Swiss-Prot record:
It is found in: Host mitochondrion outer membrane; Host cytoplasm. This is Apoptosis regulator OPG045. Interacts with host BAK1, BAX and BID. Induction: Expressed in the early phase of the viral replicative cycle. It comes from the Viruses. Pfam families: M11L (PF11099). Keywords: Early protein, Host cytoplasm, Host membrane, Host mitochondrion, Host mitochondrion outer membrane, Host-virus interaction, Inhibition of host apoptosis by viral BCL2-like protein, Membrane, Modulation of host cell apoptosis by virus. GO terms for cellular component: host cell mitochondrial outer membrane; membrane. Plays a role in the inhibition of host apoptosis. Interacts with host BAX and thereby inhibits its activity. The keyword Lipid biosynthesis does not apply. InterPro entries: Bcl-2-like_sf (IPR036834), Orthopox_F1 (IPR011207), Poxvirus_F1/C10 (IPR021119). GO terms for biological process: regulation of apoptotic process; symbiont-mediated suppression of host apoptosis. Belongs to the orthopoxvirus OPG045 family. The lineage of its organism: Viruses, Varidnaviria, Bamfordvirae, Nucleocytoviricota, Pokkesviricetes.
Length: 237
C-alpha cells in the first residue's frame, strides 16, 4: 500500500522526491522546543468568558455577604430536617394503620395522581392567574367557580383543594389567607360535591335535626379548612 500511494503524491508535487524527506531521527527532541506564548489570550476577540450554568448552586463574588448566605443555607437545612422528621412520623403512622386503612390510602393516592393529570390544565390556569402581580381573593374565587361550573366531576374539586393549599403559601397576609380558605371552601362544597359525599356516605341516624345536605356541606367545608390548616399554621408561625 505504501509503495502504491507514493508515486501518486510525487506526481502531484506533494512529495518531490523520497530522498528529500529528512530522516525522522534528525528532528529535534520535543523537550528542546521553547515555550510558546499563547498570543490568542492577548487578543480581544478571544477574551470570551464562559457563563456560569444557570443551575449553579454556589455563586460567590466580591459583593456576596457570606454570613447572609450561610444564614439562608441554614434556613434551607432546617426546613429539610423538619420535612424529613415529618415524613418519618407519617411513615411510622402508616405502618401502624390497619391493612384495610392502608389499602384505602393506596387507592386515594392512585386516584389523586389521576386527578392531577386529568385536571392539570385547569390547575395551570389558576396558577397562572395567581402568579400575576395583582389579584384579589374574589378574582380567584370567581375563576375557581367558573371552572367548577364547567366540570361537574369530583376530581377537579379535589384538585382545587390542592390548589388552595399551594396558593396559601404565596399569600403573605394571614387575614387574606383565612378569607381565601373560607371563601374557596364554600365554593368547592357545591351541590355536586355534596352529591358525591351523599353517595359514598352510609346512612347515619345521628345527624342533627337539620337537613342532611346542609350538614354534609358543613362537614365538607370543615374538612377542606382542616386540610389547609397546616399551610396556614406554617405561614403564621
Amino acid at each position: 500500500m505504501y509503495n502504491s500511494m507514493l508515486p501518486m503524491f510525487m506526481c502531484n508535487n506533494i512529495v518531490d522526491d523520497i530522498d528529500d524527506i529528512d530522516d525522522i531521527d534528525d528532528i529535534d527532541d520535543i523537550d528542546d522546543i521553547d515555550d510558546i506564548d499563547d498570543k490568542a489570550s492577548n487578543n480581544d476577540d478571544h477574551n470570551y468568558v464562559y457563563p456560569l450554568p444557570e443551575n449553579m448552586v454556589y455563586r460567590f463574588n466580591k459583593s456576596t455577604n457570606i454570613l447572609d448566605y450561610l444564614s439562608t443555607e441554614r434556613d434551607h437545612v432546617m426546613m429539610a430536617v423538619q420535612y424529613y422528621m415529618s415524613k418519618q412520623r407519617l411513615d411510622d403512622l402508616y405502618r401502624q394503620l390497619p391493612t384495610k386503612t392502608r389499602s384505602y390510602i393506596d387507592i386515594i393516592n392512585m386516584y389523586c395522581d389521576k386527578v392531577n393529570n386529568d385536571y392539570n390544565r385547569d390547575m395551570n390556569i389558576m396558577y397562572d392567574m395567581a402568579s400575576t402581580e395583582s389579584f384579589t381573593v374574589y378574582d380567584i374565587n370567581n375563576e375557581v367557580n367558573t371552572i367548577l361550573m364547567d366540570n361537574k366531576g369530583l376530581g377537579v374539586r379535589l384538585a382545587t383543594i390542592s390548589f388552595i393549599t399551594e396558593l396559601g403559601k404565596r399569600c403573605m397576609n394571614p387575614v387574606e389567607t383565612i378569607k381565601m380558605f373560607t371563601l374557596l371552601s364554600h365554593t368547592i362544597c357545591d351541590d355536586c360535591f355534596i352529591d358525591y359525599i351523599t353517595d359514598i356516605s352510609p346512612p347515619d341516624n345521628t345527624i342533627p335535626n337539620i337537613s342532611t345536605r346542609e350538614y354534609l356541606k358543613l362537614i365538607g367545608i370543615t374538612a377542606i379548612m382542616f386540610a389547609t390548616y397546616k399551610t396556614l399554621k406554617y405561614m403564621i408561625g
